[in-house]
């Protein structure tokens, strides 16, 4: 980027009137000395060795707006007054927004040779802290752990456990020999809570650890001059005032004011979003610190340009750097709850509500039925335990981490487990352009020669250059491209694909080098054959690059002059143009054709270069002629124009497809970039963010030849909004914009504006994903419901702020993330439905026991063995279930309407399947009792006699008499039977939960193998409990006769049939009463 | 997500709830219109009727498979329990405390015995036959009236001194109390191979208690349950069956000290070593007689 230099103010370049001494100010005489030194021309260069103390309240990256307009003007002279007006406005805005309080102080003046003394440096280091960004505050581990201990159902179980102990305490006071059962139960509950807490914490910690290891950086080194010596020190120890040396390829170790620089370019893309490297020199060019050429910023990189070296003084370190400030802006944005966390909370509330209300209801009933209050409390606890799915939250964590793992394999690294689902419910993606949608690499996109535009392949491998290469013009053009280029491949990369090779040179030369290497083969060899005699490198004044070569043809003694540069400058120097390999005079019509092509390519947001050549006549320039680049003793006019070539940072080849997929998934993709509107729009069009047939208001105005104001805004589907326009918008206007346009591009936006846009989207009740890689994206990444950072190009600030990292920087991985997120949401629904179902079967025994006085069908401890034993692996297995239908073709869920656990799910699980399960389990229970001598009818109201320890000859229906222990043992057998009954039906429940709408047979019974692992685990755990541990009386399991395992099978089949019926009717009558009530 | 975290005021919530309970715009009560409520209720009624019907059918089928005379499984009644009369329970098991000089302390005990033995009066046993055989009384056919099997008589007078007929105080008055020991019924249970099961009561050795061995007088003599009371064919086959009893008259219980008495049933198929079940094949009780 050239031009745009506002040489006013001189705040950054020239010395200033002394400001009052700052806290760290040096004595006044020194300052005076500095000033006097500065007046001497010799020292003028070093007078910039000032320590700047400035307050940059707001950061803006709009510094290119003015230049942008200028450039446009240059291309299109017809731009009218309102543009001029706009420009003036913009300038004002710029100043307003920047709100810079640039108070400069002489703190100390140093000689560049000397540098700081180590003692002074140590002092400053102690004063200002190390040159590193303060990591975001971490929640202490113990708090995280305690949160797991009291979160979710844990608090309910803690209450249960404490009640158990209290009940025992009261019992103990009245009767010291009271049974320890309630103590055991309380302890078991406490252990369950602690174990699940530890488990959840471990899962959480594991995923955080992946992140921590990922973030660990190789310590950066910096070359610094201290005590008049060059030293290599860790960049962390840099202090303000240090003189550092930078060379190509380095990362800038702090905010640095350049003192001298040669051919340096810095990549500011992480800060501003511009993909083009910005050249840097010691010149002061702009008041805006972001724009002036003599400041480079912390964490940006110096391009690997040939012979790039620079010396500069550190002006800000650590958190006080621009990057540091943006990072702190990001950390100021609060962490919001993830959608899935809200859903789980909602679900916990429902279940806890049911548990507590049923518990209290039956507590009251029990008290009214003249039960002892302590017994009633024990019932209350049992009801709570039966209702709370103890294992579920751990299961959810596992399911989420499984998905996280699966996504990590697909290059989506999830930092926060809960973020796994968030992408699935995302309805708006605000994507950064550079590096996310584009390859962040200039690539040749179009060529114009023979009065024709050719399209070059811009895909990642670039190998398929299919345009017509037979023309003689192409031969010449390709030669210019290859020769008039200073970029070189780093040696030793022969085996690396061309597009991946490391190049020494700037971005556009790199693009040209790779382009010609792909088409022509070994460029270095070509250059060797065409020996370079002299060259004039590109500079911003003459805006062209020129070199003169001997030709490879030994018979041709002429020198070849090749030149490339800004197209209008090149055209000026030409008098002929090459068409089909033949030189023709450059007439008006040709010039018009050139302009049309130039405008067209420029309109695509591409950077256009012109190429021309000239064979120097052999008589005037014999082989021995000595060329001089200083005096330019060779012709630079009346050359032959060969062609144009345009370059762009092309979209990644996978992006258009991914954007289409997002569209069909009902996700709005908005581009938010710091780059120019033209480029942004061009890229948006090429990736489909603005679809082919939609127009912006401006497009319509242009097409219909009317003023922008006259256009009906409803006609436009797309909108390109610049940061300037955005600044004037009220929140309501922004809401309207976001609601009315399906396709929006925001260009030239500042970090705050990104934040405003995200907030605007969130006001629409949307779940917003933000993708970005730059530091300037980090506040928005943090604010978003899910921030997605790029793993390769992403800055650490962005990665820190993000919830998810795309390891391959591939936007299409987001689509994978959306898919996985939606899948896990559906599967969690299934898991929860599966887990909730048996709650009724667990609850009914207690209710029946209280009301009808049956011997207790199942014990509280036994329940825990279902919740935490047999049911765990199956409910995890549901997380492996494949999607039922094309989940990418439906709208994202509405975060307030489409709940994880809705009324239908709860009702269907509790009142349909749950009830059937309870009946099935009771059947097994009654069978066991009946076959042992107690018929079902005789069991009713038997409770008091049955539970009495003092009745050792209770008669059964056959007249047999049972002692208390014999009854007890039978009761345990009943527990086991009931347990097995539930387990068998849970197998059916597991199978029916595989789908919510499709028939199981369509989904495939055996496609998800893990389900079968789950079923096997269920059976094995039950067998172990019954036969392996049946002799341990404390567990209340007995060895159950083989046939009882099959009593509930008909019920299980009934459940399956009933659910298939439900699904059949849902499919047959979509939208019907049945569908509304039965589809969860 | 700011929208989700909006705090609603209490009145707003109440208003929302009222709107949920009765929505005048759509005529919805609790989220459904009246007709919708009728439909859904009808569905649930139908669903539950069908489910209950199926369950009832299952239970009916289950009952059809069950033999009315013999339970399908008796694995949990391998050895009969033993009970004691009078049965007064303390904190841990049977505890019988009484004072000889205060008849109020033991009349309730003798009353228990008397009412227990009411079932063994000749009138109550009128439907049973007299048995004299010393072996098992196997009956494969239903020889008794009403398709039943015969039961052997056991009358209270067989307990002689402990029958309450000769000594209405059952020996409690003179500090030589009678305890009646009953063995629980198990269908088709055969307690031993040839010798009849016998009750054996002893003091349970307690530390720091040097006791002379317990002297017991058993009724019927030797404390045996005659084999002709076995096997038991169940309530339906033997509706008038009454358990044979053994009365143990403890002759040398020291006064004013608490002793533990253990009465075991000695028979081939009666076990008394189940650690979990204190009443299986044996009964243990604390006894304290004050003077």
Swiss-Prot record, chain B:
Statement: the UniProt record of this protein carries the keyword Ligase: no
Relate the outcome reported for changing residue 162 to S: Impairs the assembly of an active pump and its targeting to the plasma membrane
Question: Could you tell me which residues belong to the region immunoglobulin-like?
Answer: 194-291
User: Which residue ranges are assigned to the Cytoplasmic compartment in the record's topology?
Assistant: 1-36
Q: How is it modified after translation?
A: N-glycosylation is necessary for assembly and functional expression of the pump at the plasma membrane.
What happens on changing residue 152 to S?
Answer: Impairs the assembly of an active pump and its targeting to the plasma membrane
Keywords in alphabetical order: Cell adhesion, Cell membrane, Disulfide bond, Glycoprotein, Hydrogen ion transport, Ion transport, Membrane, Potassium, Potassium transport, Signal-anchor, Transmembrane, Transmembrane helix, Transport
Biological process annotations from GO: cell adhesion; intracellular potassium ion homeostasis; intracellular sodium ion homeostasis; pH reduction; potassium ion import across plasma membrane; regulation of proton transport; sodium ion export across plasma membrane
Q: Which residues lie on this side of the membrane: Extracellular?
A: 58-291
Q: What is the disulfide pattern of this chain?
A: 131-152, 162-178, 201-263
What is the official name of this protein in its record? Potassium-transporting ATPase subunit beta
Organism of provenance = Oryctolagus cuniculus
């Amino acid at each position: 980027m050239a031009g745009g230099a506002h040489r006013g103010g001189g705040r950054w370049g020239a010395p200033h009137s002394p400001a009052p001494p700052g806290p760290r100010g040096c004595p006044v005489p020194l300052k005076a000395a500095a000033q006097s030194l500065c007046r001497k021309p010799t020292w003028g260069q070093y007078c910039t060795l000032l320590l700047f103390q400035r307050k940059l309240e707001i950061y803006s990256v709009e510094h290119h707006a003015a230049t942008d307009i200028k450039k446009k003007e240059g291309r299109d002279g017809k731009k009218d007054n309102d543009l001029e007006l706009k420009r003036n406005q913009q300038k004002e805005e710029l100043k307003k927004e920047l709100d810079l309080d640039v108070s400069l102080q002489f703190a100390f003046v140093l000689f560049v040779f000397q540098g700081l003394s180590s003692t002074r440096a140590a002092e400053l280091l102690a004063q200002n802290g190390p040159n590193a960004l303060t990591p975001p505050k971490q929640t202490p581990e113990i708090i995280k752990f305690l949160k797991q201990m009291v979160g979710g159902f844990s608090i309910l179980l803690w209450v249960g456990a404490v009640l158990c102990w209290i009940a025992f305490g009261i019992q103990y006071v009245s009767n010291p020999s009271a049974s320890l059962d309630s103590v055991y139960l309380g302890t078991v509950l406490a252990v369950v809570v602690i174990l699940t807490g530890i488990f959840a914490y471990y899962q959480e910690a594991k995923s955080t650890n992946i992140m921590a290891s990922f973030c660990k950086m190789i310590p950066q080194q910096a070359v610094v001059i201290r005590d008049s010596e060059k030293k290599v020190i860790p960049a962390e120890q840099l202090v303000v005032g240090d003189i550092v040396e930078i060379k190509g390829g380095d990362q800038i170790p702090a905010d640095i004011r350049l003192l001298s620089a040669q051919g340096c370019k810095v990549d500011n893309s992480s800060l501003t979003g511009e993909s083009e490297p910005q050249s840097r020199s010691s010149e002061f060019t702009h008041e805006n610190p972001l724009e002036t050429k003599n400041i480079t910023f912390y964490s940006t990189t110096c391009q690997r340009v040939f012979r790039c070296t620079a010396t500069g003084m550190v002006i800000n370190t650590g958190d006080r750097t621009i990057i540091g400030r943006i990072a702190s802006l990001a950390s100021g944005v609060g962490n919001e709850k993830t959608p899935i966390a809200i859903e789980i909370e909602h679900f916990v509330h429902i279940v806890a509500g049911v548990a507590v209300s049923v518990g209290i209801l039956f507590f009251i009933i029990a008290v009214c039925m003249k039960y002892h209050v302590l017994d009633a409390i024990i019932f209350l606890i049992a009801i709570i335990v039966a209702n709370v799915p103890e294992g579920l939250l751990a299961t959810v964590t596992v399911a989420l981490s499984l998905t996280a793992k699966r996504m990590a394999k697909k290059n989506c690294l999830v930092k926060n487990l809960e973020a796994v689902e968030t992408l699935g419910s995302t309805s708006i993606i605000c994507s950064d352009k550079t590096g996310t949608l584009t390859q962040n690499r200039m690539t040749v996109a179009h060529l114009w020669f023979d009065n024709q535009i050719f399209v070059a392949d811009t895909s990642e491998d670039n190998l398929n250059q299919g345009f017509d290469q037979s023309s003689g013009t192409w031969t010449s053009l390709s030669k210019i491209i290859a020769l008039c280029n200073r970029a070189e491949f780093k040696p030793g990369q022969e085996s690396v694909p061309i597009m991946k090779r490391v190049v020494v040179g700037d971005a556009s030369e790199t693009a040209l080098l790779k382009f010609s290497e792909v088409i022509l083969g070994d460029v270095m060899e070509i250059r060797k054959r065409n020996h370079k005699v002299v060259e004039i490198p590109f500079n911003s004044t003459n805006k062209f690059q020129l070199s003169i070569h001997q030709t490879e043809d030994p018979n041709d003694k002429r020198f070849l002059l090749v030149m490339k540069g800004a197209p209008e400058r090149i055209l000026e120097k030409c008098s002929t143009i090459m068409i089909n390999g033949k030189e023709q005079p450059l007439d008006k019509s040709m010039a018009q054709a050139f302009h049309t092509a130039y405008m067209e390519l420029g309109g695509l947001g591409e950077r256009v270069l012109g190429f021309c050549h000239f064979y120097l006549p052999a008589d005037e320039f014999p082989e021995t002629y000595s060329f001089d680049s200083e005096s330019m003793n060779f012709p630079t006019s009346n050359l032959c124009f060969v062609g144009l070539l345009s370059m762009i940072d092309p979209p990644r080849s996978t992006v258009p497809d991914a954007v289409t997929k997002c569209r069909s998934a009902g996700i709005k993709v908005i581009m938010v970039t710091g780059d120019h509107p033209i480029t942004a729009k061009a890229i948006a069009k090429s990736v489909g963010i603005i679809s082919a047939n939609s127009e912006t208001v401006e497009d319509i105005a242009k097409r219909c030849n009317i003023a922008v104001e006259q256009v009906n805004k409803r006609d436009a589907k797309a909108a390109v909004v610049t940061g300037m326009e955005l600044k004037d918008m009220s929140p309501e206007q922004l809401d309207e914009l976001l609601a009315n346009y399906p396709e929006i591009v925001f260009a030239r936006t500042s970090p705050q504006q990104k934040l405003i846009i995200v907030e605007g989207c969130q006001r629409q009740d949307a779940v917003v994903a933000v993708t970005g890689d730059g530091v300037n994206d980090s506040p928005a990444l943090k604010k978003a419901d899910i921030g997605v950072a790029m793993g390769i190009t992403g800055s650490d600030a962005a990665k820190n702020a993000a919830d998810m990292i795309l390891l391959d920087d591939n936007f299409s991985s987001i689509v994978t993330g959306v898919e996985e997120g939606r899948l896990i949401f559906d599967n969690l629904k299934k898991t929860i439905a599966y887990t909730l179902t048996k709650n009724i079967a667990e609850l009914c025994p207690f209710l029946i026991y209280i009301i009808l006085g049956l011997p207790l069908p199942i014990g509280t401890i036994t329940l825990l063995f279902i919740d935490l034993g047999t049911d765990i692996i199956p409910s995890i297995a549901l997380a492996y279930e494949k999607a039922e239908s094309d989940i990418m073709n439906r709208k994202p869920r509405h975060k307030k309407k489409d709940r994880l656990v809705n009324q239908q799910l709860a009702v269907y699980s509790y009142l349909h399947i749950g009830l059937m399960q309870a009946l099935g389990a009771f059947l097994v229970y009654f069978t066991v009792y009946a076959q042992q001598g107690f018929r079902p009818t005789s069991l009713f109201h038997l409770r008091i006699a049955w539970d009495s320890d003092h009745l050792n000859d209770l008669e059964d229906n056959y007249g047999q008499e049972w002692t208390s222990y014999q009854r007890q043992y039978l009761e345990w057998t009943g527990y086991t039977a009931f347990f097995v009954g539930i387990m068998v039906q849970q197998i059916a429940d597991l199978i029916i939960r595989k789908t919510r709408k499709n028939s199981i047979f369509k989904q495939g019974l055996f496609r998800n193998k893990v389900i079968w692992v789950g079923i096997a685990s269920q059976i094995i755990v039950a067998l172990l409990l019954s036969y392996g541990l049946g002799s341990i009386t404390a567990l209340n399991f007995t060895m159950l006769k083989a046939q009882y395992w099959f009593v509930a099978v008909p019920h299980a089949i009934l459940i399956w049939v009933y659910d298939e019926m439900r699904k059949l009717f849902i499919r047959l009558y979509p939208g019907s009463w049945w569908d509304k009530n039965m589809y969860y | 997500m700011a929208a989700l975290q909006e705090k609603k005021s209490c009145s707003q919530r109440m208003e929302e709830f009222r709107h949920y309970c009765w929505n005048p715009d759509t005529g919805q009560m609790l989220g459904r219109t009246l007709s919708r409520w009728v439909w859904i209720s009808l569905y649930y009624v139908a669903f539950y009727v069908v489910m209950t019907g199926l369950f009832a059918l299952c239970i009916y089928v289950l009952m059809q498979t069950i033999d009315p005379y013999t339970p399908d499984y008796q694995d949990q009644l391998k050895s009969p329990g033993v009970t004691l009369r009078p049965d007064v329970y303390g904190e841990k098991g049977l505890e019988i405390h009484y004072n000889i000089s205060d008849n109020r302390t033991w009349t309730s005990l003798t009353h228990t015995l008397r009412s227990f033995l009411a079932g063994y009066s000749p009138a109550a046993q009128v439907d049973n036959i007299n048995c004299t055989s010393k072996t098992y009384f196997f009956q494969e056919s239903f020889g008794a009236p009403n398709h039943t099997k015969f039961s052997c008589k056991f009358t209270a007078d067989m307990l002689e001194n402990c029958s309450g007929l000769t000594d209405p105080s059952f020996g409690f008055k003179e500090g030589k109390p009678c305890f009646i020991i009953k063995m629980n019924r198990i269908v088709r249970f055969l307690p031993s191979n040839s010798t009849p099961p016998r009750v054996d009561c002893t003091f349970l050795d307690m530390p720091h208690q040097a006791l002379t061995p317990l002297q017991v007088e058993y009724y019927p003599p030797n404390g045996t349950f005659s084999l002709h009371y076995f096997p038991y064919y169940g309530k339906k086959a033997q509706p008038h069956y009454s358990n044979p009893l053994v009365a143990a008259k403890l002759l040398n219980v020291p006064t004013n000290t608490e002793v533990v008495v253990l009465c075991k049933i000695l028979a081939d198929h009666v076990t008394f070593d189940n650690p979990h079940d204190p009443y299986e094949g044996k009964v243990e009780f604390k006894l304290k007689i004050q003077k």
